[in-house]
């Protein structure tokens, strides 16, 4: 997880040379009250109003860089946040997945869910990067499984920057929700990962029922919807490499009905 919100920085005029602040310096320079909370720790976490945000630099040791995430506003209907990062090295390794998530009631199988409406608006202020922008949902036969793994993972790539690609290989094409997608499939430590990748460029405004993707997998790939419990419902970005950039989520809203 975007039209950019203006960032106000304290700029020193003592030197004529322009300086680009690191994410940590940016956090200190943002005027007090500009955001609800700043997250610069590896797994910095915030929650409120049925949503949560995680800085989630899980792969940071595969390269070098920095990242901070800022929660700008939240309500019962949405959360607004942004993440500023810069990463180098480990060309083909994901460095992080800063994300927003919807707090869900555990114990519901995919088959028992009628719909999963979600609306998101986002953008990147620098396209010269290698990263994706994607929904990420886990399911498991254990309704109480932790939210870092599952039996199945569903990713919906709304943005693809550079030569990055999903886990596995492309197994076909799909039309879901009136849009065309590449369908990829692969294994990640025993977890089956299905990725729907946009074929129409970045989708910066997306309003859809995510349940439709599970229905497609049930019908075409034999996904066991009656045996799999939903454990996460998240949206964010996976940076690989790139100079300092800001991923802005103007609004992320989701529900499980």
Curated annotation (Swiss-Prot):
Coiled coil: none annotated. Keywords: Carbohydrate metabolism, Cellulose degradation, Glycosidase, Hydrolase, Polysaccharide degradation, Secreted, Signal. Its EC number is 3.2.1.4. It catalyses: Endohydrolysis of (1->4)-beta-D-glucosidic linkages in cellulose, lichenin and cereal beta-D-glucans. Induction: Levels of expression are constitutively high during infection and spore formation. GO terms for biological process: cellulose catabolic process. InterPro entries: ConA-like_dom_sf, GH11/12, GH12. Belongs to the glycosyl hydrolase 12 (cellulase H) family. Endoglucanase that functions in part to hydrolyze 1,3-1,4-beta-glucan during infection and spore formation. Shows preferential hydrolysis of barley beta-glucan and lichenan. This is Endoglucanase cel12A. It comes from Pyricularia oryzae (strain 70-15 / ATCC MYA-4617 / FGSC 8958). The gene is cel12A.
């Amino acid at each position: 997880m975007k039209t950019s919100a203006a960032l106000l920085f304290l700029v020193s005029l003592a030197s004529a040379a322009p300086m680009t602040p690191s994410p940590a310096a940016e956090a200190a320079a943002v005027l007090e009250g500009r955001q609800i909370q700043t997250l610069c720790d590896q797994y910095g976490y915030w929650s409120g109003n049925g949503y949560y945000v995680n800085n989630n630099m899980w792969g940071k040791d595969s390269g070098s860089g920095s990242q901070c995430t800022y929660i700008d506003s939240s309500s019962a209907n949405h959360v607004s946040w942004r993440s500023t990062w810069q990463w180098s090295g480990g060309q083909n390794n994901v460095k992080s997945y800063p994300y927003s998530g919807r707090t869900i009631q555990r114990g519901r199988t995919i088959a028992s869910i009628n719909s999963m409406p979600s609306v998101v608006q986002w953008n990147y202020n620098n396209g010269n990067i290698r990263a994706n922008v994607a929904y990420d949902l886990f399911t498991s036969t254990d309704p109480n499984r932790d939210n870092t793994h599952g039996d199945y993972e569903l990713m919906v790539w709304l943005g693809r920057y550079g030569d990055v690609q999903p886990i596995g290989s492309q197994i076909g094409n799909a039309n879901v929700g009136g849009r065309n997608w590449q369908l990829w499939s692969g294994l990640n430590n025993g977890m089956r990962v299905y990725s729907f990748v946009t074929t129409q460029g970045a989708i910066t405004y997306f309003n859809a029922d995510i349940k439709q993707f599970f229905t497609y997998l049930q019908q075409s790939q034999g996904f066991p919807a009656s045996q799999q419990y939903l454990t996460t419902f998240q949206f964010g970005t996976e940076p690989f490499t790139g100079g300092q950039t800001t991923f802005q989520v103007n609004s992320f809203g989701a529900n499980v009905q």
